[in-house]
Design a protein with these regions (language model features):
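Long beta-sheet-rich domains in secretory-pathway and surface-associated proteins
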Residues: 1-165
């Protein structure tokens, strides 16, 4: 390639991690001779994750005594490489369980995981319990995101009848 030609290659923010070969061909306007050069480009890995409830779900849910409720948690791989995320729950008193404690997600994609919160007979109407969910990247353990949820035992409404004599 002749002197004086500058070629700039820039990866977009959603470029997928990896090595790429770029072939550049050009010819002078006064010649039919084609010149070619190959360039290599490396897109560095970027790990990123975010957690959210699906479809605008509320971070405060409700449950009955000795029952369970579920939350649909969306795990977003905001990074540019396939990644596996470890999901943990902490700070809670009630039983809290993910259907999958690890999820593998393609770059710039997401997966929904069901979180189940279970109460027993020891809770009372109006009680609540908070939990902090954390998703941690296995590609880079320093990358994580958290989401806080609160579950309340539904207050029992009804009528009470008593007789008077």
């Amino acid at each position: 390639i002749k002197n004086g030609i500058t070629v700039s290659v820039e990866a977009t923010e959603n470029a997928v991690y990896g090595d790429y070969l770029i072939n550049i061909r050009c010819k002078d306007k006064d010649s039919d001779e084609l010149e070619e050069i190959s360039l290599s480009l490396t897109v560095n890995e970027k790990a990123a994750v975010s957690l959210e409830l699906t479809n605008g779900g509320e971070s405060i849910g409700s449950v009955d005594i000795d029952n369970q409720t579920t939350y649909e948690v969306q795990v977003n791989n905001d990074g540019n490489k396939l990644d596996t995320f470890t999901l943990t729950a902490s700070g809670n008193d009630w039983d809290t369980e993910f259907e999958n404690s690890q999820v593998t997600i393609d770059a710039f994609s997401s997966q929904i995981v069901i979180l189940t919160v279970t109460t027993d007979n020891d809770v009372d109407f109006g009680d609540d319990d908070s939990v902090t969910l954390v998703a941690t990247s296995q590609n880079d353990a320093s990358i994580d995101d958290s989401l806080s949820l609160t579950t309340q035992v539904r207050v029992h409404y009804g009528l009470e009848f008593s007789t008077t004599s």
